[in-house]
A protein has these predicted regions:
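Histidine-rich, glycine-flanked metal-binding segment
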Residues: 1-56
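C-terminal cap of metal-dependent C-N hydrolases
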Residues: 11, 323-326, 377-442
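Divalent metal-coordination and catalytic microenvironments
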Residues: 11, 24, 29, 51, ...
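Metal-associated gating/positioning segment near the N- to mid-region
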Residues: 52-118
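Active-site loop-to-helix "anion-binding N-cap" substructures in soluble metabolic enzymes
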Residues: 68, 94-120, 126-133, 150-158, ...
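Alpha-helix-loop-beta-strand connector modules within alpha/beta enzyme cores
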Residues: 105-121, 168-184, 340
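Histidine/acidic residue-rich metal-binding segments in metalloenzymes
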Residues: 135-150, 154-308
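His/Asp/Glu-enriched, well-ordered alpha-helical/loop segment
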Residues: 204-225, 229-234, 280, 301-308, ...
Length: 447
C-alpha cells in the first residue's frame, strides 16, 4: 500500500513546468509524487509552506572546503552548515586548497574520511588534473569524482600545478576516453604577465591596478584554447567562474562540447564601485566593470551561461591583509549566493524560476547529479522554504562559515531561507541546525 513519509504543501511550488499549487509526497527520501494541493493523506507528517515558496535545493558545484590540511580556513562542518543556512543542499568540493589536493585515489579517500559524519548537506568531490598525474585520471574517475579541474595559470598554491596548453589537450583526450568532464580555470598566464610588467610602480592598493593586471584577454584566449581542445578530442568541458563577457564569443566553436558558469559576485559588484584597499573583493578572475556585469546577465537571459555557483573560497582574516597583490584571492559566499542572486535577478525583471534554473537545475545537469536540481518524481527530496520579500543586511558575525570575512558586509539582500531539507529531513530551520548531520558523501554514478 502506498504511504508517504512526509508531505510538503505550498501554494507556490517551483517545478520544471512552472510555479503551481502542489503537495509533494516524499517516500524514503525521494519525491514519490508531485500531487494536487488537496491530495493530503491523513496521519502523515505535513510541512505547510504557507506564504513561502518551495523550490529545489541549490546545487553549488564550486566550493573550496579546504579540509584536510587548511582547516583554519574552512572545514566540512562549517562549510556545510553555511550551505544549509543558505538553501544549498548539495556541494561539490574543489580538489585544491586541501592538503593533499584531490589528485589521487588515496587523497580522495583521505578527504572522504575527513568529511565523514560532518556533512549537514550532501557532498561530492572533484578530482584534479595536474601535470604529475596525467595518464592516471581514469583511476580517480572510477573512484567516484564528478570530473577533473585544471588551471591554465598558477593556482595560488604550490601543491596544485597548472597545465600547459599541450598538457590541456592530453588531459582532454584522456578524459574524453571515458566520457568524463573537464572543468577549467580559464586564464592563460601570458596576458597577465605582460599586463603586470606594464604596471611598473602603479599603486598595488588600488583596485584598478589589480584589475589591469588580469585583463579580459587572459580569459578570452584561455576559453578559445579550451574550446579548441574540446572540439579536437570530444571532451565535455566546463568553464569555471566566467568574469569577462568577451569570453562568451569563443564557446560556440563547432564540435566543442562546452558549458560555462558565473558567480554571484560577478553579477553584483562592479569594478568602479570597489574602494582602494578593499581586498575582501579580490578574486581571480577579477570583478570587472558594470557594462561587463550587465553582459553576463544578458548571457543568463539567453542561456549561454547555464549555471551560477558561489566559488566559495574562504581564508583567515590575516590572509586578506596587505595590497591586492599580497592578499588571498577568494570570497566566502556559499551561505549568501541564493539571496545575492535573487536580489539582483528580481531587480532586472527575472523570476524565482530563473534563479532555480541557474542555481539548482543547471549545476546539477552539468555535474551529472541526476537525482538533484528539480522537484520531479524520483529525485531526492532536497527542498527549500524561501521567503521572497523579507530582507536583511548582511552581518558577518551571523554567518556560519569559519571566518567572518565577506564583501557583502552591510549589504541589504532580499529573501530569507526559512528551512532546508535534504532527502526530506530538516537540516536547517529558523537559525537552528539538526544535531546529527544528515548529509551523505556522493560518488559519480550514484547521485
Amino acid at each position: 500500500m502506498y504511504g508517504a513519509d512526509v508531505l510538503f504543501r505550498g501554494r507556490r511550488v517551483v517545478t520544471p513546468d512552472g510555479v503551481r499549487e502542489a503537495c509533494v509526497h516524499v517516500v524514503d527520501g525521494r519525491i514519490e509524487r508531485v500531487a494536487p494541493f488537496d491530495d493530503v493523506p491523513t496521519r502523515v507528517p505535513l510541512v505547510e509552506a504557507g506564504d513561502r515558496v518551495i523550490f529545489p535545493g541549490v546545487v553549488d558545484t564550486h566550493v573550496h572546503v579546504n579540509e584536510p590540511g587548511r582547516t583554519e580556513w574552512e572545514g566540512f562542518e562549517t562549510a556545510t552548515r553555511a550551505a544549509a543556512a543558505g538553501g544549498v543542499t548539495t556541494i561539490l568540493d574543489m580538489p585544491l586548497n586541501s592538503i593533499p589536493p584531490t589528485t589521487t585515489v588515496d587523497a580522495l579517500r583521505e578527504k572522504r574520511s575527513a568529511a565523514e559524519g560532518k556533512a549537514h548537506v550532501d557532498v561530492g568531490f572533484w578530482g584534479g588534473a595536474v601535470p604529475d598525474d596525467l595518464g592516471h585520471l581514469r583511476e580517480l574517475h572510477d573512484a567516484g569524482v564528478f570530473g577533473f579541474k585544471c588551471f591554465l595559470c598558477p593556482s595560488g598554491v604550490d601543491e596544485f600545478g597548472s597545465l600547459e596548453l599541450e598538457q590541456l589537450g592530453a588531459a582532454a583526450a584522456e578524459i574524453a576516453a571515458f566520457d568524463g568532464l573537464l572543468i577549467v580555470h580559464a586564464e592563460i598566464p601570458e596576458p597577465i604577465e605582460r599586463a603586470t610588467r606594464r604596471l611598473g610602480d602603479a599603486d598595488p592598493f588600488a583596485y584598478r591596478t589589480y584589475l589591469s593586471s588580469r585583463p579580459p584577454e587572459a580569459e578570452k584566449a584561455a576559453i578559445a584554447a579550451v574550446a579548441e581542445a574540446s572540439a579536437a578530442t570530444g571532451c565535455r568541458t566546463h568553464v569555471l567562474h566566467l568574469s569577462a563577457a568577451t569570453g562568451l564569443d569563443d564557446l560556440a566553436r563547432p564540435g566543442a562540447r562546452m558549458s560555462v558558469e558565473t558567480c554571484p559576485h560577478y553579477l553584483t559588484f562592479a569594478a568602479e564601485e570597489i574602494p582602494d584597499g578593499a581586498t575582501e573583493f579580490k578574486c581571480a578572475p577579477p570583478i570587472r566593470g558594470a557594462e561587463n556585469r550587465e553582459r553576463l546577465w544578458e548571457a543568463l537571459r539567453d542561456g549561454r551561461i547555464a549555471a551560477v555557483v558561489s566559488d566559495h573560497s574562504p581564508c583567515t582574516a590575516d590572509l586578506k591583509a596587505g595590497s591586492f597583490f599580497d592578499a588571498w584571492g577568494g570570497m566566502a559566499s556559499v551561505e549568501l549566493g541564493l539571496r545575492v542572486v535573487w536580489t539582483q535577478a528580481r531587480a532586472r525583471g527575472f523570476a524565482l524560476e530563473d534563479v532555480v534554473r541557474w542555481m539548482s537545475e543547471g549545476p546539477a545537469v552539468i555535474a551529472g547529479l541526476e537525482r538533484k536540481g528539480a522537484i520531479v518524481e524520483g529525485r531526492d527530496a532536497d527542498l527549500v522554504l524561501f521567503e521572497l520579500d523579507e530582507g536583511s543586511e548582511v552581518d558577518p558575525a551571523g554567518l556560519h562559515h569559519r571566518n567572518p570575512v565577506t564583501p557583502y558586509a552591510g549589504r541589504r539582500l532580499d529573501g530569507r531561507v526559512r528551512a532546508t531539507y535534504v532527502r526530506g529531513v530538516e537540516v536547517y530551520a529558523e537559525g537552528r541546525f539538526r544535531d546529527e548531520p544528515a548529509g551523505r558523501l556522493l560518488s559519480k554514478g550514484s547521485a
